[in-house]
């Protein structure tokens, strides 16, 4: 895969699946695909995207700025504050040393990536801020290599947190993780589905999940609750028993 293709993949790995991710992917392919775009407008779009966290906005915004190092746009607080606000004085010092000494000697994406892998996330965040403020001092390959290494670390942290919740010893947490996943799927289907059948199915899924949440489920007597829910759904013609059996 190309340099820009790798960067798009790492940036998208930060975000959760959904309609917002699909829209972001389309934008990234346009920006990194060689089409001319207005940097200021692109940064405003990223800044106002509600489905992104502050760190995600900062990383995506910085990557777009790296594409146009000669553009003299004003420094954006939504990029600098998350990058400089994490970690301790010691980790920030490590990030500064990394940027000023090691990364200045790098010449390739993979060299920068391998060096960045050996540093903690907070140091890499500060290193990226230094690169963002001094974009002309580093090659695009080095800046994107450092950014992608950080994206991999962030995506790994998110994956571990998600897996921990999915394997939680608390039944309520595991059940809600399944509910949230199902609800996100239903909302995406409803928002992006073009056929009436798809939208109808999405609405039924959301209705079913709403009923399950309203009635709740007992840790000790989940089977009885499941039977009660199926009976309610049958009487109200709101859905199928397969969904109930899966999520209770």
Curated annotation (Swiss-Prot):
Entry-linked Pfam families: Flu_M1, Flu_M1_C
GO molecular function: RNA binding; structural constituent of virion
Membrane-binding as annotated region, ranges: 1-164
InterPro entries: Flu_matrix_M1, Flu_matrix_M1_C, Flu_matrix_M1_N, Flu_matrix_M1_N_sub1, Flu_matrix_M1_N_sub2, INFV_M1
Entry membrane topology: Peripheral membrane protein
Cell compartment(s), UniProt: Virion membrane; Host nucleus
Protein name (database record): Matrix protein 1
Record's keyword terms, sorted: Host nucleus, Membrane, RNA-binding, Viral matrix protein, Virion
Extra information: Influenza B virus genome RNA segment 7 encodes the M1 and BM2 (AC P08383) proteins. Normal translation produces the M1 protein. The M1 termination codon overlaps the BM2 initiation codon in an overlapping stop-start pentanucleotide 5'-UAAUG-3'. Termination of M1 translation triggers reinitiation on the BM2 AUG in the +2 open reading frame.
Gene from which this protein is expressed: M
Region span, RNP-binding: 165-248
Region forming the signal peptide: none
Family note: Belongs to the influenza viruses Matrix protein M1 family.
GO biological process, alphabetically ordered: viral budding from plasma membrane
Record note on quaternary structure: Homodimer and homomultimer. Interacts with NEP. Binds ribonucleocapsid by both interacting with genomic RNA and NP protein. May interact with HA and NA. Cannot bind NP without genomic RNA.
GO cellular component entries: host cell nucleus; membrane; virion membrane
Positions occupied by motif Nuclear localization signal: 101-105
Record function comment: Plays critical roles in virus replication, from virus entry and uncoating to assembly and budding of the virus particle. M1 binding to ribonucleocapsids (RNPs) in nucleus seems to inhibit viral transcription. Interaction of viral NEP with M1-RNP is thought to promote nuclear export of the complex, which is targeted to the virion assembly site at the apical plasma membrane in polarized epithelial cells. Interactions with NA and HA may bring M1, a non-raft-associated protein, into lipid rafts. Forms a continuous shell on the inner side of the lipid bilayer in virion, where it binds the RNP.
Main localization, broad class: virion
